[in-house]
């Protein structure tokens, strides 16, 4: 029977997602169905190696463009709420909220240090040497991608043109909600996950003093946030008239406290109603589910009722994704970006492009069908029996938390043909799945109990990537009915802020739906167990090589 809510006239929510290379918006109804979608690329600068920058004004302009597009022709009175998610990039503004440069060139339009920027290596090393108590909530070791090292870098390198003039340091999701409402309140998600804030205790003065950023404590932490809200909480009195005009939305509609993009993906999938799909997690608590948000990089989101401390895995963060639950967040620094890197750098790439274009296929759809062609009688995964990849081309985020690790490939030959490219692509996809297995095993050893993967993000659209995750972890993989789960997650925030649902959990259960379940091929387990042994041995070998080269 349909509930009364489903029979009501449609209520709409807008979700805006700012990814690494584009801004996307969606119009979503109260059942979680995506009714309209728009995307707009955003600018990126790399003035020097490991420095990655964006422009908050360029990002906001793109938000306005895509939002206007998705609400075109819609009855404005039915739009009830707006939710934002974005990468955890750092936005720097002066006391009047104007952009400040985060670069030596003094270009103030480039006022965003991107999440994947690795300029603050020396700073994060010094922060980790303090062994401060806040570090136990980031798996024991802070990442160079978090905000404290980037802030320290700005103070040490751009004192006059940036640091001394700065009035506001925002995580990008919080910048967007401020832009929409004029409210400088921060989301608990960003502050807890990237800024060392504690949901129970607030900021820790001793940490900022110890690392040389005591000036942030001034004026009750006004530069980095002193009003903190749960994700999905309504901000101020809603959308300001100015922002409403720019976005093409009704003034005063509810705007939610934001989420980081991966957390929005987790919110969009982890609460789905799985009844009738033959999954073990059906009768189990939501804590048996692991959401894997896989795009440029991958994030592995597991929640628990009590805090679980996992070495090399971020968290436990209280209420950072689902209110009332502790979050642990594993991750891989490059996944989609690594697959692109391996494929595009191969001598056969131009041939692949030409053949895929001739067939009107994406290069990955073409590669998947090419692998089926060359596999002969064996399962496709067995093509990599002699080719093994260790995927940390950009360091290891989890579970080793070692920025110095490099990528490895063993089993190369003189072959440069399309078969060779396809098999290297397969080995790379498998390596990413083995990395997920490594994270899962580490989380389980620390106290998590996981049975099902919920995949979303760009790579979840690749059937080979999904099947390899099922086969290599031995767990079923659930894919959402809406492939754009991150946007559904952002819309869920807007729905919560509007008051149309009593809780985030209710909105998750109503608005996220199972589309497809991919089960593991258990017959191939022995083969993947062997490959996994090789995988773990590779990193040990890398450490041995380093020890030899760094020895006296």
Swiss-Prot record:
It is an enzyme of class 2 (transferase). Keywords: Kinase, Transferase. The keyword Kinase applies. Its EC number is 2.7.1.47. It catalyses: D-ribulose + ATP = D-ribulose 5-phosphate + ADP + H(+). The keyword Cytoplasm does not apply. Pathway: Carbohydrate metabolism; pentose and glucuronate interconversion. GO terms for molecular function: D-ribulokinase activity. GO terms for biological process: neuron cellular homeostasis. InterPro entries: ATPase_NBD, Carb_kinase_FGGY, FGGY_C, FGGY_N, FGGY_RbtK-like. NCBIfam families: 5C_CHO_kinase. Belongs to the FGGY kinase family. Postulated to function in a metabolite repair mechanism by preventing toxic accumulation of free D-ribulose formed by non-specific phosphatase activities. Alternatively, may play a role in regulating D-ribulose 5-phosphate recycling in the pentose phosphate pathway. Can phosphorylate ribitol with low efficiency. This is FGGY carbohydrate kinase domain-containing protein. It comes from Mus musculus (Mouse). The gene is Fggy.
């Amino acid at each position: 029977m349909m509930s009364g809510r489903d029979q009501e006239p449609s209520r709409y929510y807008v979700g805006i997602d700012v990814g690494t290379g584009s801004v996307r918006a969606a119009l979503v109804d109260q059942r979680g169905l995506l009714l309209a979608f728009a995307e707009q690329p955003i600018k990126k600068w790399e003035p020097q190696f490991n420095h990655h920058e964006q422009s908050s004004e360029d990002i906001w302009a793109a938000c306005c463009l895509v939002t206007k597009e998705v609400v075109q022709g819609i009855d404005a009175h039915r739009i009830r709420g707006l939710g934002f998610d974005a990468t955890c990039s750092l936005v720097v503004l002066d006391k009047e909220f104007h952009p400040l440069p985060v670069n030596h060139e003094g270009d103030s339009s480039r006022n965003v240090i991107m999440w994947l920027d690795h300029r603050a290596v020396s700073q994060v090393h010094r922060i980790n040497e303090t062994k401060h108590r806040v570090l136990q909530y980031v798996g024991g070791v802070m990442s160079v991608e978090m905000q404290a090292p980037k802030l320290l870098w700005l103070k040490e390198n751009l004192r006059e043109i940036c640091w001394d003039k700065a009035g506001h340091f925002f995580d990008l999701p919080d910048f967007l909600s401020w832009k929409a409402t004029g409210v400088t309140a921060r989301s608990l998600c960003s502050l807890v996950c990237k800024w060392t804030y504690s949901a129970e205790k607030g900021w820790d003065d001793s940490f900022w003093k110890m690392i040389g950023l005591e000036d942030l404590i001034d004026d009750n932490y006004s530069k980095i946030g002193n009003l903190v809200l749960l994700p999905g909480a309504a901000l101020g009195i809603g959308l300001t008239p100015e922002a409403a005009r720019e976005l093409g939305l009704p003034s005063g509609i509810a705007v939610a406290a934001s989420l980081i993009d991966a957390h929005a993906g987790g919110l969009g999938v982890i609460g789905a109603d799985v009844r009738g799909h033959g999954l073990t997690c059906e009768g189990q608590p939501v804590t048996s589910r692991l959401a894997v948000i896989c795009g440029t990089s991958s994030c592995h989101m597991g929640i628990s009722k009590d805090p679980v401390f996992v070495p090399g895995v971020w968290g436990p963060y209280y209420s950072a994704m689902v209110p009332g639950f502790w979050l642990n967040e594993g991750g891989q620094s490059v996944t989609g970006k690594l697959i692109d890197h391996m494929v595009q750098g191969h001598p056969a790439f131009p041939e692949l492009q030409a053949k895929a274009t001739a067939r009107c296929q994406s290069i990955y759809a073409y590669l998947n069908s090419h692998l089926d062609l060359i596999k002969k009688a064996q399962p496709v995964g067995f093509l990599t029996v002699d080719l093994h990849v260790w995927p940390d081309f950009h360091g290891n985020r989890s579970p080793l938390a070692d920025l110095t690790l490099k990528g490895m490939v063993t089993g190369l030959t003189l072959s440069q043909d399309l078969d060779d490219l396809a098999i290297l692509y397969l080995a790379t996809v498998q390596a990413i799945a083995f990395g997920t297995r490594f994270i899962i095993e580490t989380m389980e050893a620390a106290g998590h109990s996981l049975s099902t993967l919920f995949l979303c993000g760009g790579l979840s659209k690749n059937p080979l990537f999904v099947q390899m995750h099922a086969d290599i972890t031995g767990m079923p993989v659930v894919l959402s009915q809406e492939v754009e789960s991150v946007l559904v997650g952002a819309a869920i925030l807007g729905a919560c802020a509007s008051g149309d649902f009593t809780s985030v959990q209710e909105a998750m259960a109503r608005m996220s739906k199972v589309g497809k379940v991919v089960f593991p091929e258990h017959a191939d387990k022995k083969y993947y167990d062997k490959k996994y042994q090789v995988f773990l041995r590779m990193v040990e070998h890398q450490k041995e090589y380093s020890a030899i080269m760094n020895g006296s």
